[in-house]
Regions:
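Accessory terminal and edge-of-domain segments that mediate assembly/interaction
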Residues: 1-296
Length: 296
């Protein structure tokens, strides 16, 4: 049976650079899988209607298919684009149109908890910790809950790690040579930061960006308390939603670093499109150079 890989990009500004890199023979590795016909999924909306959404692209090898979906494409436009609850509602409709995936990849921009700038760098890891900063007082715009919130989910020993992480180490020079600098406080230069032990820390149900000021440090403290020996690779909102909602034997996250923790208003907001584009593009380069090993 052909393995099914599901790639979920969070927002359109993350999916668009990923598609561009996958289709550009100057950006991707020379031995890249062929493209196939994208599937469609019908998504019920909250007003009782439906919409049909097509995968952004599909890759096919002799042993695997890889579908790229944009979560924002799937969501009800009447709901907040940052709603973890809405993201969790729509993801199962993609899972349901095919066999259970053997690998799920969460892709998007993120922050990093480091005083030094790694803006434009790319973190690749496999483990997850999800924190809900509104557990005591639910956010009316996103009330998502799950039994694994607050638990450390360790994927550091999964079999696929022996393929992707050595591959990234071998191809580091090719990946980093294609990276773009971010316009604001760029890493000099941006680098590839892969480790199977890295944790994606997902802070869920945040729909007001001003809340990141207190919610992200709270999430860091919660992760440290639950998994004191683990290293947080990136902090964002959605990798963990994908991990908890889409059942899979294996999981990888790819985070393009757009800003330092606590600096979104200084390092993203003034040049939001360009900052996020560069971070997403660089993450796309890293994922593209991983694809041959993942689909072998």
């Amino acid at each position: 049976m052909t393995n099914r890989i599901l790639i979920f990009a969070n927002k359109t500004w993350e999916a668009d650079p990923l598609v561009g890199v996958f289709r550009n023979d100057q950006a991707r590795p020379p031995k890249f899988p062929d493209f196939d016909t994208p599937p469609q999924s019908t998504i019920p909306l909250n007003d009782g209607s439906t919409k049909t959404v097509q995968a952004r692209l599909v890759l096919k090898s002799t042993s695997a298919t890889a579908e790229l979906w944009c979560i924002k494409d799937l969501m009800d436009p009447a709901r907040s684009a940052s709603s973890s609850e809405e993201k969790a509602r729509v993801l199962p409709y993609v899972t349901a149109i095919g066999p259970s995936p053997s690998l799920v990849i969460a892709f998007g921009t993120a922050t990093i908890a480091n005083a030094n700038s790694y803006n434009g760098s790319v973190v690749v890891g496999s483990s997850v910790f999800v924190h809900n900063p509104y557990s005591a007082a639910p956010n009316p715009n996103s009330r998502w809950t799950h039994g694994d919130i607050g638990k450390f989910l360790d994927s550091s020993q999964q079999p696929i790690n022996s393929a992707i992480f050595p591959s990234l180490d071998r191809d580091r020079a090719s990946v980093e040579a294609r990276m773009l600098p971010t316009p604001l406080n760029p890493a000099k230069p941006p680098i590839l930061i892969p480790s199977a032990s890295y944790v994606a820390l997902s802070n869920v149900n945040v729909t007001n960006f001003n809340d990141y000021v207190w919610a992200d440090p709270e999430a860091m403290d919660a992760c440290k308390a639950a998994a004191p020996k683990q290293s947080v690779g990136s902090v964002e909102t959605t990798h963990g939603v994908v991990r908890l909602v889409v059942p899979s034997q294996q999981f990888i996250f790819v985070s393009g670093i757009a800003n330092r923790l606590g600096y979104i208003n200084m390092e993203v907001a003034p040049r939001s499109y360009a900052q996020n584009f560069a971070a997403s593009h660089n993450a796309a380069i890293a994922l593209a150079w991983s694809i041959p090993a993942l689909m072998a």
